[in-house]
Design a protein with these regions (language model features):
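A short beta-strand-loop-beta hairpin characteristic of the jelly-roll/cupin
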Residues: 86-91, 101-103, 109-128
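Conserved metal-binding segment of the jelly-roll/cupin
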Residues: 122-142
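Short beta-strand His + acidic residue motifs that chelate non-heme Fe in jelly-roll/DSBH
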Residues: 90-91, 140-148
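A short hydrophobic beta-strand segment most commonly corresponding to one strand
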Residues: 106-108, 149-162
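Signature of the catalytic double-stranded beta-helix
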Residues: 18-23, 34-91
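Single conserved hydrophobic/aromatic residue that forms the stacking wall/gate
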Residues: 1-12
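Residue-level detector of short, conserved catalytic/binding motifs and their immediate flanks
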Residues: 75, 104, 131, 153
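A short, well-structured alpha-helix characteristic of acyl/acetyltransferase catalytic modules
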Residues: 13-29
Length: 162
């Protein structure tokens, strides 16, 4: 698990501001991880199963280049809202791949809040603007809702870099 800044602060802030702005389209999902979990979120899919599904995908070009993505499996943004406690979603992996296929997951934090990404090992990575956590795509992890900001916005990247 590695944590790093992703790029030029101004470049990244412009893109994050677009996602945080009122013109960006978000879609309601009644379940965050599994059907019936009751932990809703809003989502915007950019790439699904390697196919572009959003006209906004070009805002991600600097991330794709910086993270040296050779093949993108999926990219989506998640938006959750302030809760009364730091609720953890169910541990999961983002995408299912062949047993021997190596891929990475990166979670980019668009805003700073007391939410986090939690790993099965117990490691916790706080949501800090302009930072990403990168890890083996088969690592169990979960999102933790925030209590100190109106919203928590992240971009999830699943990709192959070899």
């Amino acid at each position: 698990i590695q944590i790093r800044l992703v790029g030029s602060e101004m470049c990244i802030r412009d893109r994050s501001n677009m996602l945080m702005g009122p013109e960006f389209p978000w879609y309601f999902l009644p379940d965050k991880v599994t059907k019936g979990d009751g932990n809703y979120q809003f989502c915007h899919n950019f790439i699904l199963s390697g196919k572009v599904v959003s006209k906004f995908v070009t805002i991600l070009d600097p991330f794709i280049k910086k993270l040296n993505m050779k093949r993108v499996i999926r990219i989506k943004a998640n938006k959750t809202f302030k809760k009364s406690s730091n609720i953890e979603s169910k541990m999961h992996i983002d995408v299912t791949r062949k047993e021997d296929e190596k891929f990475k997951t990166a979670v980019f934090y668009c805003n700073t809040n007391n939410g986090a990404t939690l790993f099965e090992s117990g490691k916790r990575v706080e949501s800090k603007e302009n930072r990403a956590v990168i890890f083996d795509g088969k690592t169990l992890h979960c999102g933790v809702d925030c209590t100190d900001s109106h919203r928590r916005v992240v971009i999830n990247f699943n990709y192959i870099d070899e």
